[in-house]
Amino acid sequence: NWLSSYDGRNKEPDQLPMKFPLLLAQGAEGIAVGMACKFLPHNFIELIDQSINHLRGKKVEFLPDFPNGGMADFSGYNDGLRGSRVRVRAKIKKLDNKTLIIYEIPFGTTTGSLIESVIKANDKGKIKIKKIEDNTSMEAEIIVHLFPGVSPDKTIDALYAFTDCEVSISPNSTIIDGDKPRFMGVSEILKVTADTTVRLLKLELEIRLDELERMWHFSTLEKLFINNEMYIDFKLYSDKETLYEYLYKRFSVFKKELLREITDEDLHKLTQIPMI
C-alpha cells in the first residue's frame, strides 16, 4: 500500500518488505497500553539454517544467542511466548584465592550496572570484597579482589545469588499482525518470515521478467520498424490517430514475432526515435 509523503508530492510505502528475520536476529523490546514485547537476539547462521529447514519441510528448532556471551538456562523458554523465562549467567573464573574475573556478562546488563550491583551487595553484607576494577576493553572483564581468608568459591555463589552476575529475562513474543496484536512463538515467526521471503523473491523475479519482456518486445518492434522502413511514409499522415492506424496495420503482419500486443505507448516511443 502506498501513502502520500509528508509534503504530499510523492508516494511512499506504508511498510518496507523484509527478506530477513531482523526482529529475531537483533531482538527488540517495546511497551504499549496493556501489552509489551521482548524478543531476544538469535544467531544469524542459525536463523538461515532453520529457515532452510522449514522450506525443506523439516523441524524448526533454535534458541537465543547473546552477543555478550555468558551461560543461559533455556528450559523455561517455551518458544519465547508469554510466561517464559530465561536465566542468564556471567562467566566467573578464579585467578587465585584472592582474585576473581567476571567476563561474558549477562544480556541486558553493562559492566557499569554489574559493578554497581556488586558494590550494593557488598554494602548490604551479602558478599565481602576488597576492591573491584573494570578492565574492559574489547571484551568485558571485571576484576574482583577478595580479603584474605574469604572463600572464592562461596563468593562466586554469592555473586550469582545477589548481583547481576545472574539475571532472569522474561521474553514476550508479541507482534502486530493485520493491525492487531498477536502472540506468536519465535519459531512460527521464522516460518512466516521464510515464506514471505520466498514470496518476495518470486515477486522480484516476476517484476524483472516483465521488465526484460518489455525490453525484448520493444527491441523487436524497433527492429521491425527500421528494417521494414515504416518511417518513410510518416509525412503522409498529418495527425497521430491516422499515423498510429497505419503503424498498427503494418505491424499486424508480424504479429507472430511479437511477445505481446502493441500499445499506443509503444508506437509513441517508436515515433520518438531520432531518425524520424
Task: Mark where each language-model region is.
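P-loop NTPase nucleotide-binding/switch module
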Residues: 1-18
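C-terminal interaction appendages of subunits in large macromolecular complexes
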Residues: 16, 22, 28-31, 35-276
